[in-house]
Amino acid sequence: MLRANRDIKSKRLITSAIIVVIILDLISLYFFKYKNQHLSISNFDLSNKGNLFNLIFSLILIVEIFLYLHYKKTKYQTGILLGFTLSMTLILILAQLFVVIKIPLPNYYILDHSLRDFIKVILFSSFQFVQFLFISYLGLSLLRTKELLFTRSIVNSIAISILLLIYAFINLYGSKVADLNEIKNKKNNYVGVVLGAAVWPKNMPSPSLASRTDKAYELLKKGIIKKIQLTGGHAPGEMSESEVAYKYLINKGIKPDDIWIEKRTASTNEQIRFIKSNLVENKNIRNIIVISDSYHLKRIQEICNFFNIQIKVVASDLSVGSENRIYHKTKESIALAVFWFFAL
């Protein structure tokens, strides 16, 4: 009897410790998301979709662990519970340290992303996958599944990941594009921000960059915007994206005084951060139109919501084939899900 009581106390202590670690992981992730984007945690908003996802999956895990402790027909496996918990926490710590320490890496690019960014996404995604694995394992255990438990947990975790990507894919169709006629009639001094895109050999704008810049040119000529803000840095050995776009606009007859240029940002996140710090906070500009390709607009809006800035979006006239459209939307779905969960 005494031994049984000790076992119960030990299980409760371990369960409590695991729940505390899961809560600390969640808090740590929230702090990282805002700190990494140079935002104060005071900007935290639980209604933000990504923050809500973080909370929901952590709560599911906590509830399952609590049920696992009290469900008498389930064998309490301390080693497995601690193994999952430690794996999650260590991967999260490693991912955050990788971002903070900035270890020197070769200047390689994988799927249009630097090696550093690619590793960063892999590390944080590994944390999330282990969390899904933990959730699946506990859920199946509570359902008294015994055969191929780990295999089924892996399959379920992959299924959860795919469902989230499908949800992100569907969300790409939910972007609200600005009503240009309404903006023109209000006669506000809007600034059109062109997000950078690839530069092709001989410092030529890629179709995406040219199309975005053409749309800014069109809006300026129609009087919908008063200034064009170009953004985008550069890869080694080429002009920055914004410089190429600047040259492109000058050749089309736009006056230099109508163009602002930024040459350091290297991602959509950095460009939205630039909009917040430079245009909204430093220049006190509130009327902003962000110009990009149609498949990109939803992620822009989600990032702006995270940064708590109000913008309007306009799609470029870029035309892509069905295969390229699926490729771009799939890539954007992954990027959107990664931003939701980790603000990367």
Tell me what each language-model feature is.
Residues 172-329:
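A structural signal for short, hydrophobic/glycine-enriched beta-strand patches
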